[in-house]
Amino acid sequence: MTEGEVCMFDETTMRCQRAAMSGNWRLFKKILEEDTKCLVEPFDLFGNTAIHVATRSNNPRLLRELLEALPEKDRWQALRKGNCVNNTLLHEIIFCTTVEMASVVFKFEKEVPEEHKGLPLLELTNNSGETPLFRAAKLGKLKMLKFMAQHAQADIRTLFVRFDKYSILHASILGQFFDVAIWLLNTDEKLAQHKDMNGMTCLQLLSNMPLVFRSQAPSMGTMKNLIYYCTSLSQYFFLLPEEGYEIDEDDGDEDGSVDFRQRSDLESGQQDKAKLPSSEFNGIGHIWQRKKQHKLAEHLAGLLVQRDFSWQISFHENFQPLIVMPVLSSKSDRIKHIHHMKEMHKTNSEIFHSKSYRPITTATSIPHSKNYTPLLMAAGSGIVEIVEKIIERYPEAICHVSQDEHNVLHMAVKHRQLKIFNMLKKHSAFKSLVSRITAEGRTLFHQISRMEFYVEQHLPGVAFQLQDELRWYERVRKIVPPHYLMHCDKDGLTAEDVLEMEHRKMHKEAKGWIKETAQSCSTVSVLVATVVFAAAYTIPGGTNQNNGTPVFLGSRVFLFFTVTDVVALVSSLVSVVMFLSILTSPFELWDFRRSLPGKLSLGFAFLFFSLVCTMLTFSATVLLTIRFENHRKWASILFCSAVFFPVAIFWRMQFPLYKMIQRFLKRLFKTLKQAIPTTFINYSTKRTHRINYHIHYH
């Protein structure tokens, strides 16, 4: 502390601060009873009084005794006094776990004479324009919110919106307190249509929160998924939050408190915790809470969908079914032309900025994403639950078109939402969605060719990411009319032109990645082949000096050694061939659709198999040489475990790449199945049914 500076708190206040910090509320009370001035003066750096701090004790008796220690005039001032952000006593009480704390405040409010009363405590706002009710909903305190709502003197719906149009329902949804949001929506249905300062309704806000829904939640792994599906919420969830408390108005005590009989509301934390899985297993409890959030979010979405009619405003006037053919016949000329136009636009923009020009906006400009309806937003976010509920309740909503001529299929395709795409394919109106051309002249081909909304997928390498992009393009090509391939957008580019331009950087990175990977793996494969080739001539146990045959020729372990050595050699050489074929390929864009990723997956599969066989060969060699029959059995088990340890490490490090092998084999099986004539499959099926019929008849 420099000269001239003094501490802003006296010794008594600092003693009281230390008592509050250590949780010694008895000493805290004793100090304040000796000097009641501290009760209404600033107690900390946030401008809280000692009574504000006393709410942290969660002790209604302490709060009541401190308020009773004040004169009547000072008591009313203490109830209304705010801290540095104007949070009053009720604003701070919402953090308490017992509603008795708020009951104490409401009791003293009733005792204030009429001439001293001003605005009710529940209507006082802080610097953000939030009442205690608003703040309770914003922080997910459902129990306290319900209790305070019972003591509101005016219509509580007047307290649900801040001065900046931000509603209490928006705040609870943004905080992911969906049980609170459901209760609020059942209290005031008009909140569903309320728009915030950005023009967003609550359903639009929820449509931009994909991670709170099961369809877009992060992957949890096989074991956690199994626990997720096996965990039941029936006895806890299906009594909805608005039914979770039973309020008995006749059982209030002398303090004006209300007896809350808990039935099944999880938010309060009053239920028998021994019955909850989270009380016994933390891991299961975390999964259970996630499932609860998914179910609450889905239920909230259903309630909001019932009150959303934004899909009725649709723009079909500018529909252009005519195909615009390219002016320049050469693809390279079209790409050069668009690059030239971009450079011209960039130069003009720099000139305008240097002269302090401002861009002219018109009513026909493309709207911001906030003007998309919840249906289109949910489709772009991949939230299957919302899209399904909207289309199920309003079947005609699937034909909704935005101002920039986007429909639900366009949003799903350009955001690469496969679940939405597959869901729409089952709908009878799917063919009509396919032919839509946007205001910028873009077909579904153009949408999938652009990387404007591309999000990097969880794939092991750039080559597989490029393969996924090409697979999307192929998926769209199967459903779009063939003549759309020649259609040009407003820039005069076909979909193939856009695909090549937008994916040029990814194509370059994919070439470098797959080259380096193939070179590294081919080196490992050659080393494995060298080892197993040398092992074939280094016979364990040696040979018979009389006839040159191996000493252990009649042993089963020796036969096992021979087979695994040969298989390891063949597998390693096949993997070398696969990697060399990758290195000698031209690396064209469409080579990354099937050829190169398929070769890489097979190369990895054979390399891993050769490593396993090499370790098996080594195990057989050791067993033949040391003869573990004369030792304990546990030594053999320990040895075999040690042998496969490096194989397990290699598999764990490269596991994402081996997952691609599984996908490759599935697609290979699907391709082979498609190659079989349909008549043969139908004939086999009919023959099977006929045989089953005769057996049943006899």
Locate the predicted segments by residue.
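Acidic, Ser/Thr- and Pro/Gly-rich low-complexity regulatory segments
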Residues: 1-522, 526, 537-549, 579-592, ...
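C-terminal interaction modules of eukaryotic adaptor/scaffold proteins
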Residues: 642-646, 656-659
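Membrane-interface segments at loop-to-transmembrane junctions
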Residues: 549-561, 591-607, 634-641, 672
